Amino acid sequence: MSVATHTPPAAPKEEYFKYTNLGPLLFGLVGAGLISLMICLMGAFVFGLKQFLFSWLFGFIYFFTMTVGSLFWVMLHYAVDAEWSVVVRRLLETVAGMFKYIWVFFLPILIWAPHIYNWMNIAPGVDPVLDSKRALLTPWFWMLRAAIYFAFFFTASYLYKRFSTEQDHTGDPGCTTRCRKLSFGGIPLFAICTTFAGVDWLMSINYHWYSTMWGVYIFAGSAWS
């Protein structure tokens, strides 16, 4: 009695991004990025550090929401076992994989945070509104939460891409099962991290203002982006 074996077909090479395939385009992209960065730094001297940091924060949030939105759709598609999404899932996984780089662009915000978030410069006992929020709005705790957000987003995006590409080579259906389990536990954590990131990085700019829907707005906006 023979045992039939099945070897999954190799995924096309286009499925895997290699920067070496870009050729001269790579140098053009790197050059354009460096020139853009130099222009941004020049803006800090022309318009002042504070204006530069607010503009940097705007740009960071723009790309952050696109990246986190891609991760959301990957998680949702696995959670509901959506078969049709396989044609776009690799693209979403690749965009979500940018979390291994995007944290670098948060460093200027982290380093010069007191220039953006005025509450970091106010001593306890000066503003009763701020004192009532000190449990959340303390510099060290704010930075710790940022590290937790990036750690979760990076880990989740890495695991999805790892299991997905592993399934390309092995054909193991268990990879899909692991991704589904990851989604069931990860979606609540995703909602919490995305909501509090929006509160920490945007709403706390004006700590007197509050909104029960701001986190939902950021969450939904990320998915839409």
Predicted regions and their residues:
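Membrane-interface interhelical loops and short amphipathic "cap" helices
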Residues: 10-19, 39-61, 82-90, 117-140, ...
